[in-house]
């Protein structure tokens, strides 16, 4: 079993990497992937904390986070597919130019 601090540090590093990718990248697909990394980092923190205290609540929260991430990814990919069909571009700047 890894110590609590090591697991939380790993989760924080993953969260910061996802946040950095979300802020820096202009492609919507990479932004969606960065958001998934952030969700998984938060879920990892739940699992590590639950394992440290010997509770199954962390694993239950992980299952909830994974199901929410799957729903978010499916809706996000459907929107990205429609945007790519209409604009032939996944740049975030093209979304801000939408009319109507």
Curated annotation (Swiss-Prot):
Gene Ontology CC terms, in alphabetical order: NADH dehydrogenase complex; plasma membrane
GO biological process: ATP synthesis coupled electron transport
Transmembrane segments: 4-24, 28-48, 60-80
Alphabetic keyword roster: Cell inner membrane, Cell membrane, Membrane, NAD, Quinone, Translocase, Transmembrane, Transmembrane helix, Transport, Ubiquinone
Catalytic class of the enzyme: translocase
Family designation: Belongs to the complex I subunit 4L family.
NCBIfam families on file: PRK05715.1-1 (NF004319), PRK05715.1-2 (NF004320)
Quaternary data: NDH-1 is composed of 13 different subunits. Subunits NuoA, H, J, K, L, M, N constitute the membrane sector of the complex.
Identification of the protein by name: NADH-quinone oxidoreductase subunit K
Organism: Klebsiella pneumoniae subsp. pneumoniae (strain ATCC 700721 / MGH 78578)
Gene: nuoK
């Amino acid at each position: 079993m890894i110590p609590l601090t090591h697991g939380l540090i790993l989760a924080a590093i993953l969260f910061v990497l996802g946040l950095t990718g979300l802020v820096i990248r202009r492609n919507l697909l990479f932004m969606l992937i960065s958001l998934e990394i952030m969700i998984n980092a938060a879920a990892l923190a739940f699992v590590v904390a639950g394992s440290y205290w010997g509770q199954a609540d962390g694993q239950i929260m992980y299952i909830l986070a994974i199901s929410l991430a799957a729903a978010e990814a499916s809706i996000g990919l459907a929107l990205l597919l429609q945007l790519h069909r209409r604009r032939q571009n996944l740049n975030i700047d093209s979304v801000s130019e939408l009319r109507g």
